Amino acid sequence: IGLETVTMNIVDKKKPDLPDFGELAGVVIMGGPMGALDYDKYPGLKAEAKLARAAVASGKPILGVCLGHQIIATALGAQLRKGDAPEIGFAPIKRVDKHDFFSMWDKQLTVLHWHNDVVGLPAEGQLLSRSSPTKVQAFRLGSALGMQFHLEVCGSLLDEWLDEPSMVKDLKAAGGSKSHLREQFAQYDQLLQPLSEQVFSGFAARCNSYAQTLNK
C-alpha cells in the first residue's frame, strides 16, 4: 500500500505496547474467535476499542473485519448479542446504501461469513449491507468502515482455517462441510476478487491520503 505496516496480536495483553498513535496513517482490526466484549479473558480487546474510538474521533481511517467490525461498533455504542444461529459459509447479503468502496457491488452479493455474534448499528452510523440473519453486515461512521463478512480470504487462508480443528467443528455445527465450503469458494472467489480489491485498495488510498497530513 506504499506505507510501512505493523501487524500485532494484542488480545492477551492488558497494556499492549502499541505504536505511537499520532504516527499511524490507519488502523485495521481483524477477526478472532473471542467475543468483542470478552475483556476479562482478553484484556487487549479494551485497548482495541479505545484505539477505535480515538481513530474515529481524529478522522483516522479504520477498518474492522468480523470481530474487528464488532469491536468498532461496540466501541461506538452499538449493542452486541448472540446471533439467532451461527452464520458460517457463503450466503447472500443485500446492499442497503452505496459507499464509494462498494460502487461496483450488485444489490445482492454472496460472500463468506464466519461468526456467531451480531452487533447493532452505532448511533449516526450509515448501514451499508445486511442479511436475513444479521441486520448489520457493513456500516460506516466517519472514518470507520466495518464489515462482518470476509472479503480478505484467499485460497491459502481458507486452507489454514480448514486445518484448524475448532473452526472445522464450528463449520460442522452450522451444518457445513469442508468439501462444500471449498466448492463454494471456487464458485464465488473470482466474482469477489475485484470487489475485495476495490474495498482494500480504497482503504489503503485513504490511509495514504491521511499519511500526507502527518507530514505537515
Residue ranges: model-predicted function:
Residues 76-157:
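Pocket-forming structural segment of enzyme catalytic cores
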Residues 34-35, 69, 118:
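Glycine-rich nucleotide phosphate-binding loop and flanking beta-alpha elements
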Residues 3-63:
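Flexible gly/pro-rich beta->alpha loop and the following alpha-helix that scaffold active-site loops
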Residues 153-216:
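Acyltransferase
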Residues 43-47, 80-81, 129-130, 163-165:
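Glycine-rich, phosphate-binding/catalytic loops in enzymes
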Residues 55-79:
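Catalytic nucleophile loop
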Residues 49-53, 102, 200:
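Short amphipathic alpha-helical segments and helix-helix/interface helices
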